[in-house]
Amino acid sequence: MAKTDLARRVYNHTWKLDPIIRSLLDTDFYKLLMLQMIWGLYPRVDATFSLINRTSSVRLADEIDEGELRAQLDHARTLRFSKKEMIWLAGNTFYGRKQIFQPEFLAWLHDFQLPEYELRRKDGQYELHFHGPWTHTTMWEIPALAIINELRSRAAMKNLGPFSLDVLYARAKAKMWSKVERLRQLPDLKISDFGTRRRHSFLWQRWCVEALKEGIGSAFTGTSNVLLAMDTDLEALGTNAHELPMVLAALAKTDDELRSAPYRVLQDWNRYYGGNLLIVLPDAFGTAAFLRNAPDWVADWTGFRPDSAPPIEGGERIIEWWKSKGKDPREKLLIFSDALDVDTIEETYRHFEGRVRMGFGWGTNLTNDFAGCAPQSIDGLKAISLVCKVTDANGHPAVKLSDNPQKATGDPKEVARYLRFFGNEERVEQLVRV
C-alpha cells in the first residue's frame, strides 16, 4: 500500500475530499457481529445512544466547530455498503468460519443507512443522541466517536506549519516504533489493534496498523477495524460489548430477569457464534456479581475479557474462579483491553506467562498517543475519555456499573438501584484517562 505523507495531507486541509468516515466498514468488527444478533433476536427494540465526555474539563463545543461536526455526521449518513464490501463480508473467513453472516442479514444490510442524529450545545459540551431502532442506532457508536476525536485533532493542528507538522509526525512515528521494539521482546505475544474509536485520525490508525504488521509480524493478530482488515488482508477481530447486557437489563420486568440478563446475552450469543468468539465480558454490572451468579456452563466458554478492573487483579480473580469450577486456566484465554500501553502490556504478560493464554487489544495508546510530540505543547492532541453508550431501551434507562466506579454510566438513581441489586464489592476506583 502506498505510504501517505501525513504532514503534507494535514497541511493541505483538503477535508472536503478527505471525509473522516470513508465507509460503513470503518467500524469495529464486533458491531457487525452484535448487529446480526440484534437484527435476528431484537428487531423491535428501540435504543438511544448518547455521547458522554468523561474528561469534562475539555469543552468539546469550544474546540470543535459545530458546522464541521454536522457536515461529517451528515456525510456518514450518505454512506452505503458497496458491492465489493458485501462480497467480502459474504465470502471471507472470520475466526476460521465461512459465511459467519447469514445471507438474509446481508440482504438487509445492503440497504443500511445510519439514522438521524440530535445535536445541540450546552455548557461548552455537545449533547449528541441517536434515537431509533437498536438495529440502526448501534451502528453510530464508532463513527460518531471517530468523527469527534479526529475533528479535535484537526482543530489542534490547524495553525501548525508544514515543518511543525513534519516534526509532530516524525516524533509520533518514532514514539510508536519504540513501542514496537519493546513488544518484540515478548515471545509468543498476541496483540491486536482496538484503536478505532479514539484514534488521532483514520490515516494515522492505518499507519499504526501497517507498522505493527511489519514490526512484530505474527505477534500482530489483526485489527478490530473492518475496513482496515479488508484493505490490509488482516484478521478482523472482536467479540461483544456492554450494550448487550445493558439493553437486556433495561428491558427486564422482574428481579429474576434483571439478574439473568448477562447470562441470557451469552445464551443468545452462543446461538450465533462459537469457538474463539465465546469470550465473556463480565463487568457490565461488576465482575464479582457476574461470577457469583454465573451458571456452571459459563466456565466452558473459551475465555474472558476483563475490561475495567486493573488487569493483573482482574485476571487473577477470573483464574481463581476457573479453578473453583475445575477448569485448567492454561487452556483458557484472557483478553486484556482496558487503557493498555507498553508498560501495562509487559507487566501483565510477564505476570501471567505460562499460566493462561493471553491476548491484548491495544486501543487509544496505540492510535492516539501524541503526548510530547508537538514542537510546542498542544492540549488538543492529548487523548480524552470519550464514549458513546446506550442510555435507554424502549424508554427504560440503561445502566453500566463497571469494575471502576469512574466508568459507571446511567441515571444516578438507576445506578444506585443497580448497585443495591448487584452489590458493590471488589470495585476499584481508578482515574480514567482514556
Swiss-Prot record:
Changes after translation: Transiently phosphorylated on a His residue during the reaction cycle. Phosphorylation strongly increases the affinity for substrates and increases the rate of nicotinate D-ribonucleotide production. Dephosphorylation regenerates the low-affinity form of the enzyme, leading to product release.
Pfam families xref list: NAPRTase, NAPRTase_N
HAMAP family tied to this protein: NAPRTase (MF_00570)
Role of this protein: Catalyzes the synthesis of beta-nicotinate D-ribonucleotide from nicotinate and 5-phospho-D-ribose 1-phosphate at the expense of ATP.
GO terms, molecular function: nicotinate phosphoribosyltransferase activity
Family: Belongs to the NAPRTase family.
Gene Ontology CC terms, in alphabetical order: cytosol
Keyword Phosphoprotein: yes
EC number per UniProt: 6.3.4.21
Record keywords: Ligase, Phosphoprotein, Pyridine nucleotide biosynthesis
Phosphohistidine sites (modified residues): 242
GO biological process, alphabetically ordered: NAD biosynthetic process via the salvage pathway
Leader peptide range in chain numbering: none
NCBIfam families listed in its UniProt record: NAPRTase (TIGR01514), PRK05321.1 (NF003704)
Annotated protein name in UniProt: Nicotinate phosphoribosyltransferase
Enzymatic reactions: nicotinate + 5-phospho-alpha-D-ribose 1-diphosphate + ATP + H2O = nicotinate beta-D-ribonucleotide + ADP + phosphate + diphosphate
Keyword hit for Chloroplast: no
Biological pathway: Cofactor biosynthesis; NAD(+) biosynthesis; nicotinate D-ribonucleotide from nicotinate: step 1/1
Origin species: Brucella abortus (strain 2308)
